[in-house]
């Protein structure tokens, strides 16, 4: 579901040090 996908993006973005979500 969309919320799970958004959480995954947030985790990946945080780990890479780049915030993609909402850019």
UniProtKB/Swiss-Prot annotation:
Compartments it resides in: Secreted
Designated name of the protein: Acidic phospholipase A2 Ts-A5
Cofactor note: Binds 1 Ca(2+) ion.
Record's catalysed reaction(s): a 1,2-diacyl-sn-glycero-3-phosphocholine + H2O = a 1-acyl-sn-glycero-3-phosphocholine + a fatty acid + H(+)
Keywords of this entry: Calcium, Disulfide bond, Hydrolase, Lipid degradation, Lipid metabolism, Metal-binding, Secreted, Toxin
Major location category of this protein: secreted
Annotated EC: 3.1.1.4
Tissue and organ distribution: Expressed by the venom gland.
PTM comment text: Contains 7 disulfide bonds.
Function of the protein: Snake venom phospholipase A2 (PLA2) that shows a moderate inhibition of ADP-induced human platelet aggregation when tested on platelet rich plasma. Exhibits high hydrolytic activities and prefers the anionic micelles (dPPC with deoxycholate) to the zwitterionic micelles (dPPC with Triton X-100). PLA2 catalyzes the calcium-dependent hydrolysis of the 2-acyl groups in 3-sn-phosphoglycerides.
GO biological process, any: lipid catabolic process
């Amino acid at each position: 579901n969309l919320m799970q996908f958004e959480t995954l993006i947030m985790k990946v973005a945080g780990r890479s040090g780049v915030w993609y979500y909402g850019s």
